[in-house]
Amino acid sequence: MQKEIYKRLIRVIPNLYSIKESGKSEASGFMDFHLDILQRKGDVLRIAISHYYKHPSGDMIPDPDMEITVNRKNETAEALTYQDTYGYQEVYSEDGSCNQSLQHSLNEFLLMWLNNLYEQGHKIE
């Protein structure tokens, strides 16, 4: 599944490794798609991708917002966190243990979301 996530991620962010800090895609009729590069360690990136909506207060709220680790050498990517209006979920606890059920669920969601982004015409370059 991690290789498929990587392939779909690169479809919507083909120049992922050359983007300095952030990027944004606008597709008519759909919410903007945002990218932030959080950390670089050689061939491994930690990124955040999100949609934002405008709250009645005027604040821009990310929903959803996911952090992902991307390994260029292995051509893999996996979900690390998920946040929306209802809460925050983390795959790995502070002691490094993995919630495998949550990991599977978030990776499935990420696959679907990346496919939807592509079908909506989103691309960050």
Where are these regions (language model features)?
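N-terminal secretory-pathway/extracellular module detecting exported/lumenal segments
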Residues: 1-63, 72-125
